[in-house]
A protein has these predicted regions:
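Cell-envelope/extracellular polymer assembly enzymes that use nucleotide-activated donors
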Residues: 47-50, 79, 231
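Glycine-rich, basic loop-to-helix element that forms the pyrophosphate-binding segment
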Residues: 110-126, 147, 200, 204
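Catalytic donor/gating beta->alpha subdomain of glycosyltransferases that bind UDP-sugars
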Residues: 221-284
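Short aromatic/hydrophobic "clamp" motif used to bind/position activated sugar donors
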Residues: 131
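A conserved acidic beta->alpha catalytic loop
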Residues: 84-93, 112, 135-138
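Short, acidic, metal-binding catalytic loop of nucleotide-sugar glycosyltransferases
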Residues: 67-77
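Short, flexible, basic/aromatic active-site loop/helix in glycosyltransferases
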Residues: 162-168, 177-206, 215, 274, ...
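Conserved donor NDP-sugar-binding/catalytic core segment of glycosyltransferases
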Residues: 143-174, 178, 250, 254
Length: 316
C-alpha cells in the first residue's frame, strides 16, 4: 500500500507525519539537518540562523541579494540583518522598504562604514547561534543555508564556505569574471577555482559560522577594512578550530562594473593582504599577492586594448 504523508511547513518548523523512515523525503532531511537525530514520525525544528549583510552603495543589487536569501526556503527561524553604511545612493531607502515588507528583516546603522564593523555589529545584535555572512554584491545558490548548516553539524567546523562564482552582466564584468576564475588572476584558492574536493581549507568565501567561535576569537578585526576574512580564518585555525570548504556551497558574485572601481577594489585588497602577511608572517602565500598582480595585468591589458582600437580606427 502507498504511504500517505503530509508535509506541513511553517516559518519555524517542518512537521512530517506518517513518513516511512526509509522514504526519500526522510533521507533528504536527515542528510540536511542533524543526521541521525530526526524522528520522522514527529516534528523537527531546523536550527535558527542569523544572516548578516554589510551594505554600502548597493542600490543595484541589494533587493536581488535579499530575495536570494528569502527564497532559500530554509525550514527554520531566520533573521536578516542589514548593516547599512553611509551611502550616496538609494541603499538606505531600499533597505527600509525591504524591512517594512518582511518582518524577518532588520536594519541597523553602521556609521563607521567598514565591512568588519558591519559584521561585528550584526553578530552583536543577532538572536541566533549560527551566523550566515552574505555579500550585498552576491546571490546565494539553491539550499546554500541548509547545506551550510548540515556541514557545520557534520564536520564540527567553526566556519564553512564554498565557491565564489563570478558572473558578469556587461561585457566588461564578464571579462573580469573570467579573470576571477583564472589561477593567474586571483591565485589558486579553492573558493575561486571550484575544482578542489571538500575538506579543511586556509580560507573560504564569505562563511557560515558558529557565533560562539566568532566571539571566542574576538570576531572580525575592525582594523582590517579589507581581507578581514583571511585574517579571521587565520585566527580561527590558530586557535585549533577548523575552516571547511565545500564545492556544494556556491555564491554568485557580481564583479565591479568599471576599470576604476575594480582597480580601487584590488589595490585596497592588496594593501590589506600585505598587512595580514606583516602581522601573521606564517600565513605568507603567493595567493596574497595575486590581487595587486591582477590589477597590474588588467590595467596594462586595458591600455594595450585601447591602443589597438585607436590604431585600428586609423588604419595603421
Amino acid at each position: 500500500a502507498s504511504i500517505r504523508h503530509e508535509l506541513h511547513r511553517s516559518r519555524k518548523s517542518i512537521q512530517i507525519r506518517g513518513l516511512d523512515r526509509a522514504s526519500p523525503v526522510c533521507r533528504r532531511i536527515k542528510r540536511l539537518f542533524r543526521p541521525g537525530t530526526i524522528a520522522c514520525m514527529s516534528s523537527y525544528l531546523a536550527p535558527p540562523v542569523s544572516v548578516v549583510i554589510p551594505v554600502r552603495n548597493e542600490e543595484r543589487y541589494l533587493e536581488e541579494s535579499v530575495a536570494g536569501v528569502l527564497n532559500q526556503g530554509y525550514p527554520g527561524p531566520m533573521e536578516i540583518i542589514l548593516a547599512i553604511a553611509p551611502s550616496t545612493d538609494r541603499t538606505a531607502e531600499i533597505a527600509q522598504d525591504l524591512a517594512v515588507r518582511d518582518d524577518r528583516i532588520r536594519v541597523i546603522d553602521n556609521p563607521d562604514g567598514t565591512t568588519p564593523k558591519a559584521l561585528n555589529l550584526g553578530v552583536a545584535v543577532s538572536q541566533y547561534d549560527i551566523i550566515v555572512r552574505v555579500d550585498a554584491h552576491g546571490e546565494l545558490g539553491p539550499e546554500y543555508i541548509a547545506t551550510a548548516v548540515e556541514l557545520l553539524e557534520r564536520t564540527g567546523a567553526a566556519n564553512v564556505g564554498g565557491i565564489m562564482d563570478a558572473k558578469g552582466r556587461t561585457p566588461f564584468e564578464q571579462a573580469v569574471a573570467v579573470a576571477y576564475t583564472s589561477k593567474l588572476g586571483l591565485g589558486n584558492s579553492a573558493f575561486h577555482q571550484g575544482d578542489a574536493p571538500e575538506g579543511p581549507a586556509e580560507t573560504v568565501f564569505l562563511g557560515v559560522f558558529r557565533k560562539a567561535d566568532l566571539e571566542a576569537v574576538g570576531g572580525f578585526c575592525p582594523e582590517f577594512d579589507r581581507a578581514q576574512d583571511w585574517e579571521l580564518n587565520y585566527r580561527l585555525r590558530q586557535s585549533g578550530r577548523e575552516v571547511w570548504f565545500s564545492p556544494n556551497l556556491r555564491v554568485t558574485y557580481r564583479p565591479r562594473s568599471t576599470v576604476k572601481a575594480l582597480a580601487k577594489q584590488f589595490f585596497r585588497t592588496g594593501q590589506w593582504r600585505r598587512e595580514v602577511m606583516r602581522r601573521h608572517r606564517d600565513s605568507v602565500s603567493l595567493r596574497y599577492v595575486a590581487a595587486p598582480i591582477a590589477v597590474t595585468g588588467i590595467t596594462a591589458g586595458t591600455i594595450l586594448g585601447l591602443i589597438g582600437v585607436v590604431h585600428a580606427a586609423k588604419g595603421t
